[in-house]
UniProtKB/Swiss-Prot annotation:
Similarity remark: Belongs to the UPF0355 family.
Stated name of the protein: UPF0355 protein SSP2326
Pfam families listed in its UniProt record: YflT
Region (Disordered), start-end ranges: 115-138
Bias (Polar residues) ranges: 118-138
Protein's organism: Staphylococcus saprophyticus subsp. saprophyticus (strain ATCC 15305 / DSM 20229 / NCIMB 8711 / NCTC 7292 / S-41)
Origin: domain of life: Bacteria
Cited InterPro entries: GSP17M-like_dom
Disulfide bonds: none
Source lineage: Bacteria, Bacillati, Bacillota, Bacilli, Bacillales
Amino acid sequence: MSEFTIVQNKEDLIDAIKSKLSEGYKESEMTVISKTKLHIDALHDSEVNLTATSGSFSDKMAKILTGEDGEEAVLAHYKLPEEELERYKKEILNDNYLVVATKDTTSHVEADKANVAFETNQTKSNSHYSEETNGPKS
């Protein structure tokens, strides 16, 4: 289940993200949805996903030709009831921001165990290498 927070300006946006971090969410579990592309230095090197509903020039042209609604296309990912979808769509069109926090409940342990790129081998006593590996981690 995703938690949606509506904010009206960039300062409140940073505060909302900090609040979600203090609630235990990771940066990678948060998305900021806006009408236009965001340029916020504080989020430049973060893992927070910044999604603009306007898209690129080619996206805009495709929307004109197909009649697709950019806000609805982005919000469809969250499988919201129609009334919530319309409410959040209206907020985006009014130049507000949505901070969406979704807990990642998947387990990544299996991938860590099966990743041969980070598998290490025992060194041979006659070897001049400090460690032999089967991948980029050396």
